Amino acid sequence: MTETEFLALVEQVLDSVERMADDWAAEQDLDIEANRSGNVLTLVFEDGTHVVINSQAAMQELWLASRSGGFHYRFDGQRWNDTRGGPGFVDALSQVCSAAAGVPLTVRL
């Protein structure tokens, strides 16, 4: 994948997650703030938890940072896979957001 294709894909992911956070806040009356600066999206939850998603274009990776650690993902044409064999991006983000919000949240891209 070219760098341009990668950046467009990341833009779609960040847009989707940002919209989802706004929807969760409105529909479930949760205090979640989504802050975007370029290719970095930070979700701030009521308890002060920060979840940061950003891209590393040179490595063609999407990174997720939370209290539980930092995770790197590569796109295989269908999904973002953990480079160390852990849960995929969607499952991992669902888990960290659910833990931070205190209610089950499901990420869909």
Curated annotation (Swiss-Prot):
Belongs to the frataxin family. One of its GO terms (molecular function) is ferric iron binding. Involved in iron-sulfur (Fe-S) cluster assembly. May act as a regulator of Fe-S biogenesis. It comes from Bordetella avium (strain 197N). Keywords: Iron, Metal-binding. It holds the Pfam family Frataxin_Cyay. GO terms for biological process: iron-sulfur cluster assembly. One of its GO terms (cellular component) is cytoplasm. This is Iron-sulfur cluster assembly protein CyaY. It comes from the Bacteria. SUPFAM superfamilies: Frataxin/Nqo15-like.
